């Protein structure tokens, strides 16, 4: 054994060939934490000092290669002064460069996944051989940063600037055949042949059949582009990527600028350019928010996994109520491998549900994400029925009938008599109390809420609602089923609107106040879209449905009359009474035409102004900043109340619920991280500034206490 650590070993294989193996003890995956980096330094030095070494194979002792840097450790570094951060990055990069500069040839044998620093380690090797089932990529832009271990330097010099820009700016994982096509790897083999293939490559390099020094040389030199080629490649790419990423996500464009700045330098000087740009990005609020989201997502996954121990396995599911929603749920279950019964009382609803599932599956086939055989398999896993005949073997039933408590109670009571005693019943409701619905059941302990967001196939969140009598097994089984469907479940306690809608309606309340104050709804939409929302509140209300919003507002007003009840008529009342229901009937705040792809296209409609005129009570001067605060303060305060009331257990879950459920701007991190970014004391002062607008703008006593004590939601 040449070197032995807790994350890395270096041992002799044969004829002067050694294997540098990553195998982090006590972890299921390899990652670059401080321990691994320190051991890599020692391992490289040990190889360098051993004259018997003729070649090095880099491998992994786990099912994946290396998943990247351990962000939980490195995030603290991002708060260091910029100069210290640059120095730390350059020190880490010296390790990779020293490995790259070894006198002997090196081969990286990539199994599983090599992401971020994992791929950057491979790029420092002379040759890369990849398992056909492996994937590689540089996903750092998704965290608001860019590759910092030489990725912006080595990748463009290996595969060309155009390909490298595409890989780095998109941040996606790339399959083996795509990696081979662009030259990111030198060979692709079946997983079982990876070790033999790596040995063959290294032997050919040792024998001189392959010239490893010549292979290495382009990575050490400047980019092979003349001035005109550089200008065309980089300026075009910056414009295109800026358009794709938008102004709130600077990392992809900064990555291109860094590649451009370093293009005329050799490796070492280029790495200095990379480190300087990386340090600037790492200290931005966008990086802080996106890294916070990543850590929150990890916490969500841990919490969801904790339910696995007591969850029952769902082998057969059922959905009550077909149509678009039922068809979407059936599709999601079937495509992820759980067969599902789809029941309705009307044949036409069944057909609508089947058409929806078939359409969604067909789109996946068109995009190459599903084979026709797999589509047929998924369709066969959806069994339409007008009766309860096959419900005896069902493990979970998702009720998705009309949003009416009496109808839901009747349907739930009926199905309870048709399923086995330990079957879970879950209501897909957006606003109706789970405790209220449970009153109709003989076994309320087997009942929970399971709130899917529309469209089901696109929205990642599922709220699993725990009622007063819901058992932990019922909650755990529903969480496990949601995960199996490919969703991100968050467990919340019962209250009107649960988490997401309870928080969304105060946001709509702020919008209603703005319209009543004479502010143009088109202007409000533009301001909030610029703030980072995927669509403004008027457009969102049209998409949700004015009737749905009207009903939801009434439910919330009944549940929280102290702050959500407003006796004045609002814009939503006016549109609802005028039968302008949004996209569903072609007119809401906007009018809708069908575009070439058959999708609704928003257009201005002057006639809506006459409809809104009676609900405009004043003409108030309101700045863009005021518009943001009228909307965001009540949303943030209601999120705080949900946390204080125990509706949601952690700040991480609250923020992720809003990002996944209503499209809260990810680069702002969620409502509670947004408060942190302003400062809790400053946010309380902001709320006080708008306190005359009503109780929705009144900070809670606990929040005031946090402000007084200098506390944050995230530390």
Curated annotation (Swiss-Prot):
Q: What is its EC number?
A: 4.2.1.17, 5.1.2.3, 5.3.3.8, 1.1.1.35
> Which GO MF terms does the UniProt record name?
3-hydroxybutyryl-CoA epimerase activity; delta(3)-delta(2)-enoyl-CoA isomerase activity; enoyl-CoA hydratase activity; long-chain-3-hydroxyacyl-CoA dehydrogenase activity; NAD+ binding
Pathway listed = Lipid metabolism; fatty acid beta-oxidation
Q: Where is this site: Important for catalytic activity?
A: 120, 140
Q: Which residues form the signal peptide?
A: none
Q: Which reaction does it catalyse?
A: a (3S)-3-hydroxyacyl-CoA + NAD(+) = a 3-oxoacyl-CoA + NADH + H(+); a (3S)-3-hydroxyacyl-CoA = a (2E)-enoyl-CoA + H2O; a 4-saturated-(3S)-3-hydroxyacyl-CoA = a (3E)-enoyl-CoA + H2O; (3S)-3-hydroxybutanoyl-CoA = (3R)-3-hydroxybutanoyl-CoA
Instruction: Say yes or no: keyword Transport present.
Output: no
Ranges in coiled-coil conformation:
none
Tell me the subunit arrangement: Heterotetramer of two alpha chains (FadB) and two beta chains (FadA).
| Primary role | Involved in the aerobic and anaerobic degradation of long-chain fatty acids via beta-oxidation cycle. Catalyzes the formation of 3-oxoacyl-CoA from enoyl-CoA via L-3-hydroxyacyl-CoA. It can also use D-3-hydroxyacyl-CoA and cis-3-enoyl-CoA as substrate.
Q: What is this protein called?
A: Fatty acid oxidation complex subunit alpha
Print the organism lineage.
Bacteria, Pseudomonadati, Pseudomonadota, Gammaproteobacteria, Pseudomonadales
């Amino acid at each position: 054994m040449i070197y032995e650590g807790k994350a890395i070993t270096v041992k002799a294989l044969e004829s002067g060939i050694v294997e540098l193996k990553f195998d982090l003890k006590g972890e299921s995956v390899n990652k670059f934490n401080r321990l691994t980096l320190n051991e890599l330094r020692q391992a490289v030095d040990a190889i360098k000092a051993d004259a018997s070494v003729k070649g090095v194979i880099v491998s992994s002792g786990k099912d994946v290669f290396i998943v990247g840097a351990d962000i939980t450790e490195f995030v603290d570094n991002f708060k260091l002064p910029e100069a210290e951060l640059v120095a730390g990055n350059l020190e880490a990069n010296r390790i990779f460069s020293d490995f790259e500069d070894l006198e002997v040839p090196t081969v990286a044998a990539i199994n599983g996944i090599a992401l971020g620093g994992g791929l950057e380690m491979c790029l420092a090797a002379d040759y890369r051989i990849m398992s056909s089932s492996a994937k590689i990529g540089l996903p750092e832009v998704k965290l608001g940063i860019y590759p910092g271990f030489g990725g912006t330097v080595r990748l463009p010099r290996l595969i060309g600037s155009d390909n490298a820009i595409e890989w780095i700016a998109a941040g996606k994982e790339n399959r083996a055949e795509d990696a081979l096509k662009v030259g990111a790897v030198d060979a692709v083999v079946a997983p079982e042949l990876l070790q033999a293939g790596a040995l063959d490559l290294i032997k050919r390099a040792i024998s001189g059949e392959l010239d490893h020094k010549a292979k290495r040389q382009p990575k050490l030199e400047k980019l092979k582009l003349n001035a005109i080629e550089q200008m065309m490649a980089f300026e075009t790419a910056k414009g295109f990527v800026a358009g794709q990423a938008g102004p709130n996500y600077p990392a992809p464009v900064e990555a291109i600028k860094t590649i451009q700045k370093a293009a005329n330098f050799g490796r070492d000087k280029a790495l200095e350019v990379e480190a300087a740009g990386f340090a600037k990005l790492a200290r931005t609020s966008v990086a802080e928010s996106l890294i916070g989201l990543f850590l929150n997502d990890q916490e969500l996954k841990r919490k969801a996994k904790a339910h696995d121990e007591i969850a029952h396995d769902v082998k057969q599911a059922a959905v009550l109520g077909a149509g678009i929603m039922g068809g979407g749920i059936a599709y999601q279950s079937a495509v992820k491998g759980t067969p599902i019964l789809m029941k309705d009382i009307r044949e036409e609803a069944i057909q609508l549900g089947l058409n929806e599932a078939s359409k969604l599956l067909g789109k996946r086939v068109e995009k190459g994400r599903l084979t026709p055989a797999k589509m047929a398999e998924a369709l066969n896993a959806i069994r339409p029925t007008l009766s309860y005949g096959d419900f005896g073997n069902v493990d979970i039933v998702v009720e998705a009938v009309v949003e009416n408590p009496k109808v839901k109670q009747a349907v739930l009571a009926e199905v309870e008599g048709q399923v086995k005693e330990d079957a879970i019943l879950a209501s897909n409701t957006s606003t109706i109390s789970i405790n209220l619905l449970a009153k109709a059941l003989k076994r309320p302990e087997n009942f929970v809420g399971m709130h899917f967001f529309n469209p089901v196939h696109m929205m990642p969140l599922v709220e699993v609602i725990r009622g007063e009598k819901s058992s932990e097994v019922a909650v755990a089984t529903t969480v496990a089923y949601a995960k199996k469907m490919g969703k991100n479940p968050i467990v919340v306690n019962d209250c009107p609107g649960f988490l997401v809608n309870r928080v969304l309606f105060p946001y709509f309340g702020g919008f209603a106040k703005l319209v009543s104050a004479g502010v143009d709804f088109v202007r409000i939409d533009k301001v909030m879209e610029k703030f980072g929302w995927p669509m403004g509140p008027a457009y969102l209300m049209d998409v949700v449905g004015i009737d749905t919003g009207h009903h939801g507002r009434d439910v919330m007003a009944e549940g929280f009359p102290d702050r959500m009840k407003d006796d004045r008529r609002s814009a939503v009342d006016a549109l609802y009474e005028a039968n302008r229901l949004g996209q569903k009937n072609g007119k809401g705040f906007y009018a809708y035409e069908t575009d070439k792809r058959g999708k609704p296209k928003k257009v201005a409609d002057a006639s809506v102004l006459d409809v809104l005129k009676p609900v405009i009570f004043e003409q108030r001067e309101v700045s863009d900043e005021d518009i943001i605060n009228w909307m965001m303060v009540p949303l943030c305060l209601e999120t705080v109340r949900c946390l204080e009331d125990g509706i949601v257990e952690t700040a991480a879950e609250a923020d992720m619920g809003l990002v996944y459920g209503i499209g809260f701007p990810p680069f702002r991190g969620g409502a509670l991280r947004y408060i942190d970014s302003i400062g809790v004391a400053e946010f309380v002062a902001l709320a006080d500034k708008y306190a005359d607008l009503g109780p929705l703008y009144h900070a809670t006593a606990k929040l005031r206490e946090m402000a007084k004590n200098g506390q944050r939601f995230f530390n």
